[in-house]
Amino acid sequence: MLPPLSSSPVQPNHPWRRWLLLSVGLGVAAVAGVLLWQQARQRRQVFVSITSWPANEYLYLAEQKQLGQPFGIDLRVKQSSSLEDQRLAFVRGDVNVMATTLPEAIAVCQEAPARCPELVLVMDESVGADRLIARQLLASPAALAGQRVGLERTVLAEYLLLRSLEGHPVDIEDLQLRFEGPVALVELMRAGAIDAVVSYPPYDFPLRQDKRFHEIFSSRLMPGEVVDVLAVAPETVRSHQREIQALVRTWWAAQAYARRHRSEAVGVMAQRQQISPEEFNQSEDRLRYPSASQQRSLLADDGPVAQTIERMAGLLRAARRIQPDAPLPRPTTALLADP
């Protein structure tokens, strides 16, 4: 028989052994807690203002699935009720990053030149999602003279209306404009209080199934002009480059997640928009998502986005919607990041 290793073996329930185990356990927990705290501190909160629009829901998906954490950020979306409310919040400095349209970015430069944003990512292009819908008796935009036309008080809505009237003997001053929020506009249209409306998903779904109405113009007829971008305040670009690059990577992570888990992702995004997954898929049929490899050419100094901004500004100046001497948003490739 082997002799005992000690003449006075330590019993499992000895008081100082329990104290030692407790001390070791507390030490391990403390170290783990410190590491988690340090990781949390290293993840910067990044707030992005969004409106109700199918492409913007990918940012919400990224927030819910914490897809920014591998890149060192904690993404938080801030919902705005309309493009106008979002733009005014950006002008005031309440938000520094927003997913918005080119016309709204142009408007920021008019209202607050010092806040004129830099455009760091092209999120999507509307290829028919933004629509001018009218009563069946109104066959084309030329028939809108003297009619009641509803739209949001946004530069995008006015721009789409101006583009629809090009080539027709009708000016925007010939229309009876009615300004309301996106939900109220659809209700006015269904009630017969207006004759045409500028609308988009998810708000336009009740009008799609109503045989009293039809589409007379859409962004499909103005390719490359209605795009959504990540617009960032210039001081934020200078002071938080790493976080903005991480945000761009998070966008690509959300796109990749949605490809891998399509049903789940669509369910999350559709529920937030209060539409069915089928309707969400339908709304995406009228969108195009540029790839990561296309971003550098899109955002080049003389690229498509810069050229579109110049064309838009020219039309808005001619319509006396903006001042001729204000700066314009600047596309930049400096903060592009690979997925």
PLM region descriptions:
Residues 21-34:
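Hydrophobic membrane-insertion alpha-helices, especially the h-region
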Residues 102-104, 177-178, 183-273:
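Pocket-lining segment of extracytoplasmic ligand-binding domains
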Residues 310-339:
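Conserved C-terminal helix/tail region of periplasmic/extracytoplasmic solute-binding proteins
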Residues 239-321:
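Secondary-structure end/capping motifs
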Residues 66, 88, 92, 106, ...:
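Solvent-exposed, polar/charged alpha-helical surfaces in well-ordered, non-transmembrane soluble domains
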Residues 33-171, 176-179, 195-199, 214-216, ...:
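Short, glycine-/small- and polar/acidic-enriched structural segments
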Residues 13-21:
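Twin-arginine (Tat) signal peptide motif
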Residues 1-14:
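N-terminal Lys/Arg-rich, disordered targeting/topogenic segments
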